[in-house]
Amino acid sequence: MESLPIVLLSLISKAVVLICSLLTLIIQNSTAVTWGLACVWLAYVSFRFLFQVKITVHPAARETFESMVRKFQAESMFSEEATPCIVSVGDKDADLTPDPQREDIKIVKSSRRVSYAVRVAHVAKAQVGLLANSRANELVYSRLCREEMVKHGVRPSHIAHMVPLAVAACFIPLDSDFLAASIRQGEGMRERRALLGPSWEKXGGLLVTSGFTTPTWRGDPRGMLVTKGPPLAKPRKLYRFTGMGTHIRYGVHDHSLGNVRRGLVERLYMVEVKGELQPTPKPTPGAFNQMSRFSDRLSIHLPKTTRLTPREFLGFYTGRKLERYQKAVESLEMHPVREKDAWLSTFVKAEKLNITAKPDPAPRVIQPRDPRYNVEVGRFLRHSEEMLFKAINKTFGGRTIFKGLSSDQAGEEFKTLWDSFKDPVGIGMDASRFDQHISKDALEFEHKMWLSMFPKSERAELARLLSWQINNRGLARCPDGEIRYRVEGCRMSGDMNTSSGNCYIMCATVHNWCDNIKHIKHFRLANNGDDCMLVVERSDEKKVRNGLIEYYATLGFTMKVEPTVDVLERLEFCQTRPVLVDGKYRMVRNLHQSMSKDLHSLHDLDSSAARNAWVTAVGTGGRCMNDGVPVLKEFFKQFPDYNLEVKKGSDMAQKLRDDWKYKFNRTAAFQDLIPTQESRYSFWLAFGLLPDEQIALENGFSPLKMEIVNEQIQEETSLLQFSGA
């Protein structure tokens, strides 16, 4: 307080000099413009003067700061009289005391506010350490301090006053911070580090690995005939960029007899229960009859339609699919569709497998039917799909089906959905191997809905076509053998109605469950097939969870219910989470998916032209997808851009277009947006990566090297392994 006159005198003298300068200018140039500018400038200077005086000379600022430092020193590891950082209640020297009106609420003693702020700051810094003084880190500390005070039961009005003080205390360096900085910058440290020799730049390259066949051979389901052949001669290839610091490894399954057999056994016929295989569970007889209320409500919004002509159906497709279906249409003009066209042609899906998480997963098989069958079913269902999705949205009272939305649209829809609740929580629902658990009863329930959309004159033909999806016959030809099989029910991955049918069944089951719980008036669902996020009020969470797994068991499904989340950014949906980017929410892919999976390719990259085309396409798409997103934008800027124009219609162009299948595509042009402080905070909420860690990762990226190497490069330890991202 003694310095107040000096500060005021200094500021007043500056203001007098500025005012005199302005008056001189006005006298010399007495024009309207000059007078106007002078008045504006004078008002601005006056405002800044008053504001600066108010902030600089706040009577409690210096005293409070010094008190905080003393408290930190009293509880320092270097103090022999250190006091434990524990918040007690009711004691003479306690920071908190019970509220006279409510015992479950605590108030902060006026004489102990600084002490309490420092203790809370200790807890926050114990979690994340000393962070740089930035707006993003201020938000991090603010959230941690607020959560700690809520845990203590502090009165909300006191929390509002205490959080700013606690946040300010978080940014005060401790004695140990000064000591550590002195050690790092000391001459002794430099001398010892010099003994290590020069630090070489990490080098990496493109490593080629072969596909594999699972060693697991178990289960003996009825309806499957296996014929062995010669050994597999040509395995698949997986290309991976090494030396990038990513710790997740991927592999690829070969299209082999062993992989097809295990895929059919464990993804079609049987499920694993306590380490043993058992037949896939069936629903309780009549279980799907309880969905009639949802079907009745949906029918109000579901319009009637008619079958498309072959030409109209072909209008939905381009490229290779158009060529394939065009040939099928020409064939159907010669010979009508028959049941044999619905038989399955089975092969192992070529996909990147996270073998770090699961070294020996069951292979995923693709089971398409003949294009002739798809054309005939598609003439009924291809255009009806969008009508169904709109009807489901109306039945739920808002956007429910998220298929076809861009990442920006999906993020804003999640924000709107979340804001429609007073105190929302999200419950993730994961139906284990959903396609496998789609029973005959579930298919018949779905087919009944499709039939209701068409006139009686067309229902018989549609019913005949759909009935061939219930009793299935399949053939898998592999280089080392073949498998013939029969199965009742199950969803086949190549069917025209796989996506829409799964959406309908999942939405019906969720709506039926929530609608039958008493006193739940508001619930919303985000659905993309078997991937669901149910949002309800916090007060309804226990009622929704109670009995949910058992309910799905009666329907023949094995449902896994994820832990409840109460922060928008922590909603997990299709391996993406909402992140605030450039003022709006956008669905951002999981860090590990982006920074590990995208460094692998199933395309043949032996030639330099193929490598350059692939890396350019992935980098261009990744930068566009993550423009303005912390870490990920800089990660994809590592990918070289060779400014190549891949010839349209070529195999490489088609493969690149098919391979870049982010579930939430983004078409905006790359603008190289700089992540805002709010984005860094939102990114931390979503993936657990602190703003300082984000910046450290970004500073460590360097351009990819495209040379093929014959041995694996040692990976560097990544912050992602410890950040909880």
Swiss-Prot record:
Repressor in keyword set: no
Domain RdRp catalytic residues, every copy: 424-544
Catalysed reaction equations from the record: RNA(n) + a ribonucleoside 5'-triphosphate = RNA(n+1) + diphosphate
Keyword Nucleotidyltransferase assigned: yes
EC number: 2.7.7.48
Entry-linked Gene3D superfamilies: 3.30.70.270
Gene Ontology biological process: viral RNA genome replication
Keyword terms: Nucleotide-binding, Nucleotidyltransferase, RNA suppression of termination, RNA-directed RNA polymerase, Transferase, Viral RNA replication
Domain of life (superkingdom): Viruses
GO molecular function, one term: RNA-directed RNA polymerase activity
Other known facts: Readthrough of the terminator UAG occurs at position 203.
Record-stated family: Belongs to the tombusviridae RNA polymerase family.
Cited function: RNA-dependent RNA polymerase that plays an essential role in the virus replication.
Stated name of the protein: RNA-directed RNA polymerase
Native source species: Tobacco necrosis virus (strain D)
